[in-house]
Amino acid sequence: MVDSMKFVEKAKIEFENPIVIEAFPGTGLVGSIAGFQIIKDLNLKYFGYFEVDGILPLTTIEKGIPYPPVRAYANKDFIILFSDIIISPFKINGLAEFIVKTFSNKNPKLFVSLGGIMAGKSEKVFGIANKEELIEDLKNYVEIFDFGVVGGMGGNLLIKCHDNGFDAIGLLAETVGIRPDPRGGANLLEVLNKMFNLNVNIENLIKEAEAIENKLKELAEQHLKMMSKSRKEYPMYI
């Protein structure tokens, strides 16, 4: 499966033991939201893209220029893996292995996977890691995810990293559900800022989250009023 994948480099960057951050779409899109903010705030360069057989033939247009859907942005310290499409479950295992294989020659300091867990709220960020020593370090920043199941790229990437001798952690933000959750993304960024001194601005994400929450509250109130009115006018149908 890995043989049918390819990474095409589009820029030459002199890396200095970079941190590789996987920010593919998942629950609440929290990883994608955080990844996009890092790319924007750190002004990362378009580094290259993945060719993966069988993924959606979608092309992203930014300022009139087309980009492949699964791509990477970087500077000397960070490589952000970003995708505009949800990766098929049948491709995840092979792609995780290919990611480790592709970036192993960049002498990465650490692999980080960003994801979400459905909790009906957006408060905590949990951590997982592929080594006991990393777990101890994570405890300084987040609560450890003791038991459960992790879907998507995250768990697979940590296992493939361990198989190949690379350190890897996963950060899992609580999220309200399947809709985009900027507050969950902001919570991830808050942890990443502390861990890696990113200094990424999260105020805009918080404002966006508050706007979404206020709109949902307004819609809920309208729905309750409508239901109350319906009960009075048409009691036999409620």
Curated annotation (Swiss-Prot):
Its main location: membrane. It holds the Pfam family PAC2. It is a multi-pass membrane protein. It comes from the Archaea. It is found in: Cell membrane. The chain crosses the membrane at residues 19-39, 79-99, 141-161. InterPro entries: MJ0106-like, Proteasome_assmbl_chaperone_2, PSMG2_sf. SUPFAM superfamilies: Cgl1923-like (SSF159659). This is Uncharacterized protein MJ0106.
